[in-house]
Amino acid sequence: MRNRKLGIDYSSDDFEGCPVETTLDIIGGKWKGILLYHLIDGKKRFNEFRKLYPKITQRMLTLQLRELERDGVIHREVYKQVPPKVEYSLTEFGRTLEPVILHMKDWGEKYKDRIDKLEAARKAEDKI
């Protein structure tokens, strides 16, 4: 990996133990942050996530939820009833990520216009 601004080459070993990388290992991924954000308000069912974000495929949603469950961030509660009912909620460990997710939301709101302009400029540049 190369930092172009500083002109420094890094190996992947240079980032081992980096706290930011540790955090991103847990919440990184296109949908994980969004899923966690919606779980801050309380339990959600699988189809509630599908309705909130219809662009996420069932397979991807399943994978992201499984990874969060595997990492101890969310709890999957299966109710013994017909039809089956499954709810997802934040674990105590998952709740420790709440301020991180809320800060990310605040940052996104603050800089959304700037990011949108950058994205538009990139798209215009790609057309050239």
UniProtKB/Swiss-Prot annotation:
Keywords: DNA-binding, Transcription, Transcription regulation. Disulfide bonds: none annotated. The keyword GTP-binding does not apply. Residues 18-116 form the HTH hxlR-type domain. Pfam families: HxlR. GO terms for molecular function: DNA binding. It comes from the Bacteria. Coiled coil: none annotated. The keyword Transcription regulation applies. This is Uncharacterized HTH-type transcriptional regulator YdeP. It comes from Bacillus subtilis (strain 168).
